[in-house]
């Protein structure tokens, strides 16, 4: 007779996987202030690999993740093996970020981890928007390990994957656990925007969604963050 699979074993497995995910490198930051579940953070410059994909939030996340994972797992040309470069594997980092973009948008926004940031229009001086719902075009980012520079990173073989250095910025961050549906992400975004308005803190960019865990992580162990760039206090 088979012994039943105890729920505590399942929970322990989820904890183990969650801890393993958190062992990956993350961008360093300084916490400037903290109130409840909201932090104001200062991030130094770092490099991202990013791609633009179409679809709803879930479909775009999967497409973008696969494209950039393909790059870091070896679909590239090493910068260190000239004149006949081979491929090079790059360590996975966290978070992965996503941002929604307008159909003709060319502007690139920061990620901190997978994150989401909506752009109001293609114009570079367009106002920021707090809406993450109903977007059909997204930019997905992976943060590159800190050991690399733009010159030393392998060159993507896929022209849809681009490398970019993100300048130092200050962010308001709201963390939470669980699944990320579009309505839930919008709820958290609205909560963070309301807090910024109450504190009279100027937002400078569009909200982004940062996700730190692999998809098999149990919901209660998932680490998610909504991030909005702000004027440094």
Give residue ranges: language-model regions.
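A solvent-exposed interaction/effector surface
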Residues: 2-233
